[in-house]
């Protein structure tokens, strides 16, 4: 069974199965359009003459009416086609009444029938926090059940082909998330409703917000570049080992060697194997030289500096990806907290949408961390730490009066810079750290699977965008 799981073909089949499941869910989500249509009916604008009685009105088409109480001719601008209570709806009407009064009526209805679509079932404080935090913990823990099934333990040649496919899936997911989810939501105009007039709103749009979003995306890319350069500088100048050796050997009958090494050598913790191989090689040289077991004066030059450089680069990219994931989880937490403020049904729908989005995202992050030098357990623990960002976002949305911050994120605008800045980070990690790994020489079948994996990651983000 383990041998079958290690086959990268089965992983490709699994990704396609997941995409098919997303299509089924997307098809089912089509029923949700009915709710949106009804909601639009409540806020839309239509011209018509309504047929109303004492209890409710059903607005449709054009015509004339004689009402049972206000007997007269009415011309109204109704918002939507709906069955309403006596004063339900938002209408501007001119009525000529034969019994009581004549004149111009202007009403803003705020009441709806029990069970009408879009109603907010307000929750008490304790229940609200329990639902919101429970949903956040669910979306943070659920992907780990999928990670346990991935037969990749470390970045070793035995798992290289499968890891490359997962990396391609990760790059597609990151790019799709940035261009199809974060940036479009940041560009969406948002409206402001007042409590006195919930039906009225005005949107902000224009070149200013678009330019601002673009600048924040670029700021995210530049910020991640600066962070990576800083980390490389801290690790040792260029992020990889430098060994400048000036060897001065004085040979005699005992073959004593003397060397001077200048420069600092900084290695990742996971790079212990090359040093042990150097020691073995040095031991063999000492044996050939007559059994000299004295200490060496300086370290030997690394066998493959380019390979060590690559490993260090990837380790930095792993931490950068964690930082971007932390910010992204914060926005997810804001959306969940704000949605539960709007009602239990809206909160559950948002939670399911975020969960479908997080599963492929966490798989991609796991692949990046393993490629960066982490073991499977280390990668899972590091990903679990990013759940702190989601919990912080949920708490922020719940503590903010009226859920203003969270509502903007849930609606797509977000606190000005968070979404586009995170998108810039995702673009940097995908293009600078992950995609270059896919350019390594591989067989035609492996290359095809990697391209399919990338397209699969993008397809998942397309489905998520459709669901939202």
Swiss-Prot record:
Factors inducing expression: In cardiomyocytes, high-glucose exposure up-regulated SLC39A7 expression and induced its phosphorylation.
Localization terms from the record: Endoplasmic reticulum membrane; Golgi apparatus, cis-Golgi network membrane
Q: Which reaction does it catalyse?
A: Zn(2+)(in) = Zn(2+)(out)
Q: Which UniProt keywords apply?
A: Endoplasmic reticulum, Golgi apparatus, Ion transport, Membrane, Methylation, Phosphoprotein, Transmembrane, Transmembrane helix, Transport, Zinc, Zinc transport
A GO CC annotation recorded here is: endoplasmic reticulum membrane
Q: How does it sit in the membrane?
A: Multi-pass membrane protein
One GO biological process term: regulation of ferroptosis
Report the residues modified as Pros-methylhistidine.
Answer: 64
Q: TM spans, by residue?
A: 10-30, 132-152, 163-183, 208-228, 385-405, 409-429, 447-467
Q: Where is this region: Disordered?
A: 36-116, 237-313
Extent of Basic residues compositional bias: 237-248
> Which residue stretches does the UniProt record annotate as biased composition, category Basic and acidic residues?
36-56, 64-100, 249-312
Q: What are the disulfide bonds? A: none
Looking up InterPro entries in the UniProt record yields: ZIP
Q: How is it modified after translation?
A: Rapidly phosphorylated by CK2 following Zn(2+) treatment. This phosphorylation is required for efficient cytosolic Zn(2+) release.
**GO molecular function per UniProt:** zinc ion transmembrane transporter activity
Major location category of this protein: endoplasmic reticulum
Subunit info here reads: Homodimer.
The family database entries (PANTHER family) matched by this protein are listed as: ZINC TRANSPORTER SLC39A7 (PTHR16950:SF25), ZINC TRANSPORTER SLC39A7 HISTIDINE-RICH MEMBRANE PROTEIN KE4 (PTHR16950)
Q: Family per UniProt?
A: Belongs to the ZIP transporter (TC 2.A.5) family. KE4/Catsup subfamily.
Function noted in UniProt: Transports Zn(2+) from the endoplasmic reticulum (ER)/Golgi apparatus to the cytosol, playing an essential role in the regulation of cytosolic zinc levels. Acts as a gatekeeper of zinc release from intracellular stores, requiring post-translational activation by phosphorylation on residues, resulting in activation of multiple downstream pathways leading to cell growth and proliferation. Has an essential role in B cell development and is required for proper B cell receptor signaling.
Q: What is this protein called?
A: Zinc transporter SLC39A7
Q: Identify the coding gene.
A: Slc39a7
